[in-house]
Curated annotation (Swiss-Prot):
Keywords: Ribonucleoprotein, Ribosomal protein. Belongs to the universal ribosomal protein uS9 family. InterPro entries: Ribosomal_Su5_D2-typ_SF, Ribosomal_uS9, Ribosomal_uS9_bac/plastid, Ribosomal_uS9_CS, Ribsml_uS5_D2-typ_fold_subgr. Gene3D superfamilies: 3.30.230.10. This is Small ribosomal subunit protein uS9. Residues 109-130 are annotated as: Disordered. The keyword Transcription regulation does not apply. Pfam families: Ribosomal_S9 (PF00380). It comes from Oleidesulfovibrio alaskensis (strain ATCC BAA-1058 / DSM 17464 / G20) (Desulfovibrio alaskensis). SUPFAM superfamilies: Ribosomal protein S5 domain 2-like. The keyword Hydrolase does not apply. It comes from the Bacteria.
Length: 130
């Protein structure tokens, strides 16, 4: 039998997180592994828990996340974005606090592409006057 869940998609840089919130005890699973195993750095674990701590729902939901693309920081921030969006489906009253904290805003900053005739996105080749 399928269990009722709330869904949220989060993105950051090239990372995409598909998040499902089930009513439960606070267990977070990322790509089939516990989140503290998938993100061993405490700072990244804190990023993931931020929307839950802000809305006082740390032990109210079991969260299953499928995240792809990007690096570990981008993935953690995509998960945070996805959890925040899924929490809105649970209770729309959380919107103001989540919005104020900036968890609902898609951070659109991406890596700028390298241009031809230059060494990098903005850096030019070294120029010798003489």
């Amino acid at each position: 039998m399928t269990q009722e869940f709330n869904y949220g998609t989060g993105r950051r840089k090239t990372a995409t997180a598909r998040t499902r919130l089930y009513s439960g005890t606070g267990k977070i699973v990322v790509n089939g592994r516990p989140y503290d195993e998938y993100f061993p750095r405490k700072s990244l674990q804190m990023i993931i828990r931020q929307p839950l701590a802000l809305t006082k729902n740390v032990e109210s939901f079991d969260i299953h996340v499928n995240v792809q693309g990007g690096g570990v920081r981008g993935q953690a921030e995509a998960v945070r974005h996805g959890i925040s969006r899924a929490l809105l489906e649970v209770d729309v009253e959380m919107r103001s606090s989540l919005k104020r904290a900036g968890f609902l805003t898609r951070d659109a900053r991406k890596k700028e592409r390298k241009k031809y005739g230059q060494r990098a996105a903005r850096a030019r080749f070294q120029y010798s006057k003489r």
